């Protein structure tokens, strides 16, 4: 993550950063909610979300349609049928300190108006570390069970839910005709340890932690597997109810108990921040002895009428907040440091540890974040260890399970350091493809520059290459890319972009099983795939540049370069000429080509350095050569036809359902006539083109007095009627 403070970001940098954060947070949402295998801690995830929110607060007109601030969870997994929740399953805001809790309580009082101190009751309940579930009953009979999914649509796991003994299949007489009980499916620590002992005895790989195991168990296609896992449930909330049997949160908890649902015995009704914090600390002291994982305490306004008055923000209720626990710690020996290469080329140091139990989980690896963290330097250049020491192999280290997910080393027991311990030297070369690794100014992370050739990044790079705004090859989605990348037959393999364009020829020459005879394909779909590939042998220059996956060269910057250089030959020539003659240097500021690169509108030194790094790496140039040999030709950008255009230099927003063109076609047309496009309406907007169904953007335009026209008027305006 970049170190540039939010208040110092320029608008182009903010656009780039919001694009990166949207992509990165979506990736981690997918890992956590859909795949049950998170790769970063809760704290690191929360930091990404907070940075995204801070940038959006400073640049509200840059909020993306795919912004993490507008999304809950992730889309449901395709192997299960989808269930639309009658009432959305929203996430909660987080508190990380006593002050955060006091601020939350204060905000409730301020919103509700003048009230006596401590007059509002709150419930406080342990935050179970499991999988959120909504269970629907109609006329007392269990009808469906669904995961939270993206908050609006979840996965139908009804068959598996029925195997959980603690969830009643039938409600007692007198229950409302429609009831949705919400709660958390989890696995007890004792059952988790027993399962791992069984797996080890059978010579199978053991599981990482109870939360992931519970989530994976619930998503089994075979309900017998789910039944064997001894899953449990705590009820704590509700969705649709045809009639409310209580008027307080605590009253509903008691109703759940009467209906036969387990409710957490540590739930209490309290008043004021002091009582909430005292209960939080009491639960924290009991945490290690509990037979289930918890990662905090949830506070809710008790009276339901006050909950209704307080209402909701876009993704979370105003009447509730989750107070997170700090991570648990233990001491062990650092045996080694390995370097892993992530899907985006980031080099991450990983500590290999003498096995140690932290919070009930055996830990053998821990993240070391980056070079600076090993040296004891924080994100803002501050020293993060009191006596300014680094981390060395052989050290006795303090390990923390941050967010109960990814362990990290937080400190060193310096008195136990051996006399011959030496500082760790961070590599400047990718351990996977041996391309040079660079660390951009203002960043803490080294990144491999062999993006198109590095095996660690290959699948992600190919997915990006064929994505909608790049080569847009229909029939090459995520699953197909995974299939071709891992294919054992060389005539089917797609390891680099050039392989896409030689696939048909290689298949024609193959004596082995043909693609159309492989399950999941067929003659028709294979023909469509080949046609889609061949249709992209000639590709618009900006799409080609975006498809290369050069760091910081997103869709917007790719268009800027295309408009500035007009041909790929001119762009490549400038990039190669800007490569410094001295190995190890990243820029040659006296170089004319370098000055030309940074002079492109909206392009600064950070983006230009990324371009130069890409072209300085011989492996990338080799991949490009192979791409051209395979018959790919970037089509020269047409110079803007906007001379005298009435929209030249204006900012245009398209909204509603366009009937004569797609949204992408509309944006391309506007840019062709010299206009800029935006995704939201602000004071900087000059024109709004509204189709049927235009909503909030149309209202905002009217409020700001911005000109609004329909689609037909747009075509007339630009002279294409």
UniProtKB/Swiss-Prot annotation:
Q: Name the coenzymes or cofactors required.
A: Mg(2+); Mn(2+)
Q: Name one GO biological process term.
A: DNA replication
Can you provide one Gene Ontology molecular function annotated for this UniProt record?
metal ion binding
User: What are the UniProt keywords, alphabetically?
Assistant: DNA damage, DNA repair, DNA replication, Ligase, Magnesium, Manganese, Metal-binding, NAD, Zinc
Give me the Gene Ontology terms describing cellular component: cytosol
Q: Does the keyword DNA damage apply?
A: yes
- Domain BRCT per the UniProt entry, residue ranges: 642-721
Family recorded in the similarity comment: Belongs to the NAD-dependent DNA ligase family. LigA subfamily.
Tell me the protein's name: DNA ligase
List the source organism: Brucella anthropi (strain ATCC 49188 / DSM 6882 / CCUG 24695 / JCM 21032 / LMG 3331 / NBRC 15819 / NCTC 12168 / Alc 37)
Q: Which gene encodes it?
A: ligA
